[in-house]
Protein backbone atom coordinates (compact mmCIF):
# COMPACT_ATOMS: atom_id res chain seq x y z
CA UNK A 1 0.00 0.00 0.00
CA UNK A 2 1.14 3.51 -0.82
CA UNK A 3 -0.35 6.58 0.80
CA UNK A 4 -0.07 10.32 0.29
CA UNK A 5 -1.69 12.89 2.60
CA UNK A 6 -2.19 16.33 1.06
CA UNK A 7 -3.43 19.30 3.14
CA UNK A 8 -6.20 21.19 1.33
CA UNK A 9 -6.80 23.72 4.12
CA UNK A 10 -6.17 23.94 7.87
CA UNK A 11 -9.29 21.80 8.37
CA UNK A 12 -9.34 19.57 5.28
CA UNK A 13 -7.07 16.87 3.85
CA UNK A 14 -6.96 14.55 0.86
CA UNK A 15 -5.69 11.01 1.30
CA UNK A 16 -4.54 9.08 -1.76
CA UNK A 17 -4.24 5.32 -1.30
CA UNK A 18 -2.76 3.03 -3.96
CA UNK A 19 -3.44 -0.68 -3.43
CA UNK A 20 -1.83 -3.52 -5.31
CA UNK A 21 -3.78 -6.35 -6.93
CA UNK A 22 -2.79 -8.57 -3.99
CA UNK A 23 -4.39 -6.05 -1.61
CA UNK A 24 -7.64 -5.28 -3.43
CA UNK A 25 -8.00 -8.58 -5.34
CA UNK A 26 -9.57 -10.71 -2.58
CA UNK A 27 -12.29 -8.13 -1.91
CA UNK A 28 -12.91 -7.67 -5.64
CA UNK A 29 -13.24 -11.43 -6.18
CA UNK A 30 -15.57 -11.69 -3.19
CA UNK A 31 -17.87 -9.04 -4.67
CA UNK A 32 -17.61 -10.69 -8.09
CA UNK A 33 -18.62 -14.08 -6.67
CA UNK A 34 -21.58 -12.45 -4.90
CA UNK A 35 -22.66 -10.79 -8.15
CA UNK A 36 -22.33 -14.08 -10.02
CA UNK A 37 -24.60 -15.72 -7.46
CA UNK A 38 -27.27 -13.01 -7.30
CA UNK A 39 -27.29 -11.03 -10.57
CA UNK A 40 -29.76 -12.25 -13.17
CA UNK A 41 -28.78 -11.72 -16.81
CA UNK A 42 -31.44 -12.37 -19.40
CA UNK A 43 -30.75 -15.56 -21.37
CA UNK A 44 -28.62 -17.15 -18.67
CA UNK A 45 -29.32 -19.06 -15.48
CA UNK A 46 -28.06 -17.45 -12.29
CA UNK A 47 -24.40 -18.30 -11.81
CA UNK A 48 -23.89 -19.37 -15.42
CA UNK A 49 -23.41 -16.04 -17.21
CA UNK A 50 -20.00 -15.59 -18.91
CA UNK A 51 -17.52 -13.79 -16.64
CA UNK A 52 -16.74 -11.16 -19.28
CA UNK A 53 -20.44 -10.26 -19.66
CA UNK A 54 -20.90 -10.22 -15.87
CA UNK A 55 -17.96 -7.84 -15.43
CA UNK A 56 -19.30 -5.61 -18.19
CA UNK A 57 -22.77 -5.33 -16.67
CA UNK A 58 -22.04 -5.50 -12.92
CA UNK A 59 -18.46 -4.22 -12.98
CA UNK A 60 -19.19 -0.55 -12.12
CA UNK A 61 -21.29 -1.45 -9.06
CA UNK A 62 -18.67 -4.01 -7.97
CA UNK A 63 -15.92 -1.41 -8.22
CA UNK A 64 -17.93 1.11 -6.18
CA UNK A 65 -18.59 -1.47 -3.46
CA UNK A 66 -14.92 -2.48 -3.32
CA UNK A 67 -13.75 1.16 -3.26
CA UNK A 68 -16.12 2.02 -0.39
CA UNK A 69 -15.21 -1.01 1.73
CA UNK A 70 -11.45 -0.76 1.26
CA UNK A 71 -11.52 3.04 1.49
CA UNK A 72 -13.20 2.83 4.89
CA UNK A 73 -10.89 0.07 6.12
CA UNK A 74 -7.60 1.67 5.11
CA UNK A 75 -8.72 5.17 6.12
CA UNK A 76 -9.33 3.97 9.68
CA UNK A 77 -5.95 2.23 9.82
CA UNK A 78 -4.08 5.23 8.41
CA UNK A 79 -5.61 7.96 10.60
CA UNK A 80 -4.96 5.81 13.67
CA UNK A 81 -1.33 5.29 12.70
CA UNK A 82 -0.84 8.96 11.76
CA UNK A 83 -2.70 10.26 14.85
CA UNK A 84 -5.11 12.25 12.66
CA UNK A 85 -8.28 13.54 14.32
CA UNK A 86 -11.05 13.44 11.69
CA UNK A 87 -14.01 15.78 12.13
CA UNK A 88 -16.30 13.81 9.80
CA UNK A 89 -16.50 10.65 7.73
CA UNK A 90 -14.21 10.52 4.72
CA UNK A 91 -15.85 10.88 1.32
CA UNK A 92 -14.50 9.14 -1.79
CA UNK A 93 -13.61 11.94 -4.19
CA UNK A 94 -12.34 9.61 -6.92
CA UNK A 95 -11.17 6.07 -7.55
CA UNK A 96 -9.63 4.18 -10.46
CA UNK A 97 -9.05 0.47 -11.16
CA UNK A 98 -6.39 -1.07 -13.36
CA UNK A 99 -5.42 -4.71 -13.57
CA UNK A 100 -2.62 -4.07 -11.08
CA UNK A 101 -3.77 -1.18 -8.87
CA UNK A 102 -6.70 0.47 -7.16
CA UNK A 103 -6.19 4.20 -6.57
CA UNK A 104 -8.48 5.86 -4.01
CA UNK A 105 -8.76 9.55 -3.21
CA UNK A 106 -10.54 10.39 0.05
CA UNK A 107 -11.43 13.88 1.27
CA UNK A 108 -12.19 14.56 4.93
CA UNK A 109 -12.15 17.31 7.55
CA UNK A 110 -9.82 17.31 10.54
CA UNK A 111 -9.45 19.01 13.88
CA UNK A 112 -6.91 21.75 13.15
CA UNK A 113 -3.52 21.98 14.79
CA UNK A 114 -3.13 25.23 16.73
CA UNK A 115 -1.37 26.78 19.70
CA UNK A 116 -3.58 28.11 22.46
CA UNK A 117 -2.92 31.70 23.49
CA UNK A 118 -1.61 32.06 27.05
CA UNK A 119 -4.64 32.81 29.18
CA UNK A 120 -3.00 32.99 32.61
CA UNK A 121 -3.25 36.79 32.57
CA UNK A 122 -7.01 36.89 31.99
CA UNK A 123 -9.15 38.42 34.75
CA UNK A 124 -12.84 37.87 35.32
CA UNK A 125 -15.49 38.98 37.80
CA UNK A 126 -17.74 36.34 39.30
CA UNK A 127 -21.05 37.30 40.84
CA UNK A 128 -21.45 36.27 44.47
CA UNK A 129 -25.20 36.19 44.97
CA UNK A 130 -26.15 36.57 48.63
CA UNK A 131 -29.52 35.03 49.45
CA UNK A 132 -31.07 36.79 52.44
CA UNK A 133 -34.42 36.68 54.21
CA UNK A 134 -35.85 39.20 51.74
CA UNK A 135 -35.08 36.94 48.78
CA UNK A 136 -36.52 33.90 50.56
CA UNK A 137 -39.77 35.73 51.37
CA UNK A 138 -39.99 36.99 47.78
CA UNK A 139 -39.62 33.45 46.48
CA UNK A 140 -42.22 32.13 48.90
CA UNK A 141 -44.61 34.85 47.76
CA UNK A 142 -44.18 33.63 44.19
CA UNK A 143 -44.95 30.09 45.33
CA UNK A 144 -48.02 31.24 47.24
CA UNK A 145 -49.34 33.05 44.17
CA UNK A 146 -50.06 29.72 42.51
CA UNK A 147 -52.26 28.87 45.50
CA UNK A 148 -53.90 32.28 45.82
CA UNK A 149 -57.45 33.38 45.06
CA UNK A 150 -58.51 36.33 42.90
CA UNK A 151 -61.02 38.46 44.81
CA UNK A 152 -62.87 41.65 43.91
CA UNK A 153 -61.40 44.81 45.43
CA UNK A 154 -63.27 48.07 46.05
CA UNK A 155 -60.00 49.92 46.50
CA UNK A 156 -58.13 51.79 43.77
CA UNK A 157 -56.04 49.51 41.56
CA UNK A 158 -52.53 48.97 42.90
CA UNK A 159 -49.39 47.85 41.10
CA UNK A 160 -50.17 44.17 41.78
CA UNK A 161 -53.85 44.21 40.85
CA UNK A 162 -55.64 43.17 37.68
CA UNK A 163 -58.01 45.72 36.16
CA UNK A 164 -60.91 44.36 34.11
CA UNK A 165 -62.56 46.71 31.67
CA UNK A 166 -64.34 47.24 28.37
CA UNK A 167 -62.09 48.85 25.77
CA UNK A 168 -63.24 50.87 22.74
CA UNK A 169 -61.10 52.52 20.07
CA UNK A 170 -61.76 56.03 18.74
CA UNK A 171 -62.04 56.27 14.96
CA UNK A 172 -60.42 58.95 12.78
CA UNK A 173 -63.40 61.24 13.37
CA UNK A 174 -62.88 61.07 17.12
CA UNK A 175 -65.95 58.92 17.74
CA UNK A 176 -66.05 55.64 19.61
CA UNK A 177 -66.10 52.63 17.28
CA UNK A 178 -68.55 50.13 18.78
CA UNK A 179 -67.32 47.42 16.40
CA UNK A 180 -63.90 47.61 18.06
CA UNK A 181 -65.22 46.87 21.54
CA UNK A 182 -63.27 44.33 23.59
CA UNK A 183 -65.29 43.38 26.65
CA UNK A 184 -63.81 42.25 29.96
CA UNK A 185 -60.21 42.72 28.93
CA UNK A 186 -57.76 41.90 31.73
CA UNK A 187 -54.96 44.42 32.34
CA UNK A 188 -52.37 42.98 34.75
CA UNK A 189 -50.70 45.93 36.41
CA UNK A 190 -47.86 43.79 37.73
CA UNK A 191 -46.75 42.48 34.36
CA UNK A 192 -47.34 45.50 32.12
CA UNK A 193 -44.16 47.58 31.58
CA UNK A 194 -43.96 50.72 33.71
CA UNK A 195 -44.16 52.94 30.61
CA UNK A 196 -47.22 51.17 29.18
CA UNK A 197 -49.95 53.81 28.63
CA UNK A 198 -52.74 51.47 29.77
CA UNK A 199 -50.90 50.75 33.02
CA UNK A 200 -50.30 54.46 33.62
CA UNK A 201 -53.95 55.33 32.96
CA UNK A 202 -55.49 52.50 35.01
CA UNK A 203 -53.36 52.62 38.16
CA UNK A 204 -55.42 54.05 41.01
CA UNK A 205 -58.75 53.58 39.22
CA UNK A 206 -61.83 51.78 40.60
CA UNK A 207 -64.87 50.06 39.13
CA UNK A 208 -67.00 52.59 37.25
CA UNK A 209 -64.11 54.85 36.33
CA UNK A 210 -63.64 55.73 32.65
CA UNK A 211 -60.20 56.57 31.27
CA UNK A 212 -58.85 57.61 27.92
CA UNK A 213 -55.60 56.04 26.74
CA UNK A 214 -53.36 57.35 23.98
CA UNK A 215 -51.10 54.66 22.57
CA UNK A 216 -48.31 55.83 20.25
CA UNK A 217 -46.50 52.97 18.48
CA UNK A 218 -42.72 53.26 18.18
CA UNK A 219 -41.69 53.46 14.54
CA UNK A 220 -38.67 51.29 13.72
CA UNK A 221 -36.36 51.47 10.75
CA UNK A 222 -35.63 48.54 8.44
CA UNK A 223 -32.92 47.22 10.76
CA UNK A 224 -35.25 47.11 13.75
CA UNK A 225 -33.73 50.17 15.43
CA UNK A 226 -35.94 52.94 16.75
CA UNK A 227 -36.17 55.53 14.00
CA UNK A 228 -35.26 59.16 14.59
CA UNK A 229 -37.71 62.00 14.09
CA UNK A 230 -35.90 63.00 10.90
CA UNK A 231 -36.22 59.67 9.08
CA UNK A 232 -39.39 58.24 10.61
CA UNK A 233 -42.75 58.48 8.96
CA UNK A 234 -45.50 60.11 10.96
CA UNK A 235 -47.18 57.52 13.16
CA UNK A 236 -50.70 58.32 14.28
CA UNK A 237 -51.40 57.64 17.94
CA UNK A 238 -54.37 55.38 18.68
CA UNK A 239 -56.91 56.55 21.27
CA UNK A 240 -58.88 54.16 23.46
CA UNK A 241 -61.56 54.48 26.08
CA UNK A 242 -61.54 51.94 28.90
CA UNK A 243 -64.47 51.58 31.28
CA UNK A 244 -63.33 49.81 34.44
CA UNK A 245 -65.80 47.10 35.41
CA UNK A 246 -63.86 45.40 38.20
CA UNK A 247 -60.57 45.42 40.07
CA UNK A 248 -59.22 42.00 41.04
CA UNK A 249 -56.65 41.42 43.75
CA UNK A 250 -54.75 38.20 44.38
CA UNK A 251 -55.35 37.10 47.95
CA UNK A 252 -52.51 34.91 49.17
CA UNK A 253 -53.11 32.07 51.63
CA UNK A 254 -51.40 32.08 55.00
CA UNK A 255 -48.28 29.94 55.04
CA UNK A 256 -48.81 27.36 57.76
CA UNK A 257 -47.79 23.75 58.36
CA UNK A 258 -50.82 22.34 56.55
CA UNK A 259 -50.19 24.41 53.44
CA UNK A 260 -46.49 23.46 53.55
CA UNK A 261 -47.47 19.78 53.45
CA UNK A 262 -49.68 20.43 50.42
CA UNK A 263 -47.15 22.56 48.55
CA UNK A 264 -44.24 20.19 49.19
CA UNK A 265 -46.31 17.04 48.69
CA UNK A 266 -45.48 15.90 52.23
CA UNK A 267 -41.71 16.47 51.85
CA UNK A 268 -41.92 18.99 54.68
CA UNK A 269 -44.35 19.24 57.58
CA UNK A 270 -43.47 22.62 59.03
CA UNK A 271 -42.84 26.16 57.84
CA UNK A 272 -39.28 26.42 59.17
CA UNK A 273 -38.02 23.39 57.22
CA UNK A 274 -39.84 24.56 54.10
CA UNK A 275 -38.23 28.01 54.29
CA UNK A 276 -34.82 26.43 54.83
CA UNK A 277 -35.31 24.35 51.68
CA UNK A 278 -36.40 27.41 49.69
CA UNK A 279 -33.22 29.17 50.81
CA UNK A 280 -31.11 26.14 49.85
CA UNK A 281 -32.75 25.89 46.42
CA UNK A 282 -32.15 29.59 45.80
CA UNK A 283 -28.52 29.33 46.85
CA UNK A 284 -27.94 26.34 44.58
CA UNK A 285 -29.71 28.05 41.68
CA UNK A 286 -27.70 31.25 41.92
CA UNK A 287 -24.43 29.40 42.53
CA UNK A 288 -25.07 27.56 39.28
CA UNK A 289 -25.99 30.82 37.56
CA UNK A 290 -22.80 32.43 38.81
CA UNK A 291 -20.71 29.49 37.55
CA UNK A 292 -22.48 29.50 34.18
CA UNK A 293 -22.06 33.25 33.76
CA UNK A 294 -18.36 32.96 34.55
CA UNK A 295 -17.96 30.08 32.10
CA UNK A 296 -19.73 32.11 29.42
CA UNK A 297 -17.38 35.04 30.03
CA UNK A 298 -14.33 32.76 29.91
CA UNK A 299 -15.45 30.98 26.75
CA UNK A 300 -16.28 34.29 25.06
CA UNK A 301 -12.83 35.68 25.85
CA UNK A 302 -10.95 32.56 24.77
CA UNK A 303 -12.94 32.20 21.55
CA UNK A 304 -12.22 35.85 20.76
CA UNK A 305 -8.49 35.47 21.46
CA UNK A 306 -8.13 32.17 19.56
CA UNK A 307 -9.59 32.50 16.03
CA UNK A 308 -9.15 28.78 15.39
CA UNK A 309 -10.29 27.58 11.93
CA UNK A 310 -13.35 25.38 12.39
CA UNK A 311 -14.33 22.36 10.26
CA UNK A 312 -17.54 23.06 8.37
CA UNK A 313 -19.05 19.73 9.46
CA UNK A 314 -18.69 20.74 13.12
CA UNK A 315 -20.39 24.07 12.49
CA UNK A 316 -23.27 22.35 10.70
CA UNK A 317 -23.61 19.89 13.55
CA UNK A 318 -23.98 22.74 16.05
CA UNK A 319 -26.44 24.48 13.72
CA UNK A 320 -28.57 21.34 13.78
CA UNK A 321 -28.34 21.20 17.58
CA UNK A 322 -29.36 24.85 18.00
CA UNK A 323 -32.21 24.35 15.54
CA UNK A 324 -33.51 21.35 17.49
CA UNK A 325 -33.23 23.26 20.77
CA UNK A 326 -35.32 26.08 19.31
CA UNK A 327 -37.86 23.60 18.00
CA UNK A 328 -38.21 21.93 21.42
CA UNK A 329 -38.98 25.30 22.98
CA UNK A 330 -41.91 25.55 20.57
CA UNK A 331 -43.31 22.14 21.56
CA UNK A 332 -41.45 20.33 18.81
CA UNK A 333 -42.61 22.23 15.74
CA UNK A 334 -42.07 25.60 14.10
CA UNK A 335 -45.14 27.62 13.04
CA UNK A 336 -46.56 26.95 9.60
CA UNK A 337 -44.68 28.94 6.95
CA UNK A 338 -41.68 29.50 9.23
CA UNK A 339 -38.44 30.05 7.28
CA UNK A 340 -36.44 27.18 8.78
CA UNK A 341 -33.63 27.51 6.22
CA UNK A 342 -33.17 31.21 6.91
CA UNK A 343 -33.38 30.70 10.67
CA UNK A 344 -30.76 27.94 10.51
CA UNK A 345 -28.47 30.18 8.46
CA UNK A 346 -28.86 33.00 11.00
CA UNK A 347 -27.46 30.71 13.70
CA UNK A 348 -24.23 29.95 11.84
CA UNK A 349 -22.11 32.55 13.68
CA UNK A 350 -23.29 31.22 17.03
CA UNK A 351 -22.72 27.64 15.90
CA UNK A 352 -19.19 28.52 14.81
CA UNK A 353 -18.44 29.93 18.27
CA UNK A 354 -19.73 26.73 19.88
CA UNK A 355 -17.54 24.64 17.59
CA UNK A 356 -14.48 26.82 18.23
CA UNK A 357 -15.03 26.60 21.98
CA UNK A 358 -15.22 22.80 21.73
CA UNK A 359 -11.85 22.73 19.94
CA UNK A 360 -10.36 25.02 22.60
CA UNK A 361 -11.62 22.85 25.47
CA UNK A 362 -10.19 19.77 23.76
CA UNK A 363 -6.86 21.59 23.55
CA UNK A 364 -6.99 22.47 27.25
CA UNK A 365 -7.72 18.83 28.08
CA UNK A 366 -4.81 17.72 25.91
CA UNK A 367 -2.39 20.27 27.42
CA UNK A 368 -3.33 19.21 30.95
CA UNK A 369 -3.47 15.48 30.11
CA UNK A 370 -7.03 15.29 31.46
CA UNK A 371 -8.81 11.94 31.40
CA UNK A 372 -11.99 10.46 32.86
CA UNK A 373 -11.58 7.29 34.91
CA UNK A 374 -14.04 4.88 36.52
CA UNK A 375 -13.14 6.50 39.84
CA UNK A 376 -14.25 9.85 38.44
CA UNK A 377 -17.61 8.39 37.44
CA UNK A 378 -18.10 6.86 40.90
CA UNK A 379 -17.25 10.19 42.56
CA UNK A 380 -19.65 12.01 40.23
CA UNK A 381 -22.41 9.52 41.07
CA UNK A 382 -21.79 9.90 44.81
CA UNK A 383 -22.04 13.69 44.49
CA UNK A 384 -25.34 13.41 42.61
CA UNK A 385 -26.70 10.92 45.15
CA UNK A 386 -25.83 13.33 47.94
CA UNK A 387 -28.36 15.79 46.54
CA UNK A 388 -31.21 13.34 47.11
CA UNK A 389 -31.16 10.80 49.94
CA UNK A 390 -33.82 8.71 48.18
CA UNK A 391 -31.41 7.78 45.37
CA UNK A 392 -29.61 4.42 45.45
CA UNK A 393 -25.90 5.09 44.97
CA UNK A 394 -25.14 1.60 43.59
CA UNK A 395 -27.92 1.90 41.04
CA UNK A 396 -26.72 5.36 39.97
CA UNK A 397 -23.16 4.07 39.47
CA UNK A 398 -24.41 1.17 37.34
CA UNK A 399 -26.55 3.54 35.28
CA UNK A 400 -23.72 6.03 34.74
CA UNK A 401 -21.37 3.24 33.63
CA UNK A 402 -23.90 1.72 31.23
CA UNK A 403 -23.38 2.18 27.45
CA UNK A 404 -26.43 4.46 27.23
CA UNK A 405 -25.07 6.97 29.76
CA UNK A 406 -21.30 6.49 29.96
CA UNK A 407 -20.29 8.91 27.18
CA UNK A 408 -22.67 11.62 28.37
CA UNK A 409 -21.48 11.38 31.98
CA UNK A 410 -17.83 11.22 30.92
CA UNK A 411 -18.34 14.35 28.80
CA UNK A 412 -19.92 16.17 31.76
CA UNK A 413 -17.00 15.22 34.01
CA UNK A 414 -14.46 16.28 31.38
CA UNK A 415 -16.17 19.67 30.99
CA UNK A 416 -15.90 20.20 34.74
CA UNK A 417 -12.21 19.24 34.70
CA UNK A 418 -11.52 21.63 31.83
CA UNK A 419 -13.41 24.40 33.64
CA UNK A 420 -11.32 23.81 36.78
CA UNK A 421 -8.09 23.73 34.76
CA UNK A 422 -8.92 27.12 33.26
CA UNK A 423 -10.16 28.81 36.44
CA UNK A 424 -7.01 27.67 38.29
CA UNK A 425 -4.88 29.75 35.89
CA UNK A 426 -6.99 32.88 35.41
CA UNK A 427 -7.76 35.51 38.04
CA UNK A 428 -11.34 35.47 39.27
CA UNK A 429 -12.58 38.23 41.56
CA UNK A 430 -15.84 37.67 43.38
CA UNK A 431 -18.24 40.59 43.60
CA UNK A 432 -21.24 40.65 45.90
CA UNK A 433 -24.28 40.94 43.65
CA UNK A 434 -27.97 41.46 44.47
CA UNK A 435 -30.17 38.50 43.67
CA UNK A 436 -32.18 39.51 40.58
CA UNK A 437 -35.94 39.60 40.87
CA UNK A 438 -37.93 37.26 38.70
CA UNK A 439 -41.59 36.90 37.97
CA UNK A 440 -43.86 33.94 37.48
UniProtKB/Swiss-Prot annotation:
Top-level division of the source organism's lineage: Bacteria
Role this protein plays: Involved in protein export. Acts as a chaperone by maintaining the newly synthesized protein in an open conformation. Functions as a peptidyl-prolyl cis-trans isomerase.
Listed GO biological process terms: cell division; protein folding; protein transport
Subcellular location: Cytoplasm
GO MF: peptidyl-prolyl cis-trans isomerase activity
Record protein name field: Trigger factor
A GO-annotated cellular component: cytoplasm
Pfam family, one: Trigger_N
InterPro entries found in the cross-reference section: PPIase_dom_sf, Trig_fac, Trigger_fac_C, Trigger_fac_C_sf, Trigger_fac_ribosome-bd_bac, Trigger_fac_ribosome-bd_sf, Trigger_fact/SurA_dom_sf
TM region positions: none
Class of the enzyme per the UniProt entry, highest EC level: isomerase
UniProt keyword annotations, A-Z: Cell cycle, Cell division, Chaperone, Cytoplasm, Isomerase, Rotamase
Domain notes: Consists of 3 domains; the N-terminus binds the ribosome, the middle domain has PPIase activity, while the C-terminus has intrinsic chaperone activity on its own.
SUPFAM superfamilies reported in the protein's UniProt record: FKBP-like, Triger factor/SurA peptide-binding domain-like, Trigger factor ribosome-binding domain
Record flagged with keyword Cell cycle: yes
Catalytic reaction equation(s): [protein]-peptidylproline (omega=180) = [protein]-peptidylproline (omega=0)
Alphabetized Gene3D superfamilies for the sequence: 3.10.50.40, Trigger factor ribosome-binding domain, Trigger factor, C-terminal domain
Residues of the PPIase FKBP-type domain: 160-253
Family according to the record: Belongs to the FKBP-type PPIase family. Tig subfamily.
EC number(s) from the headed UniProt entry: 5.2.1.8
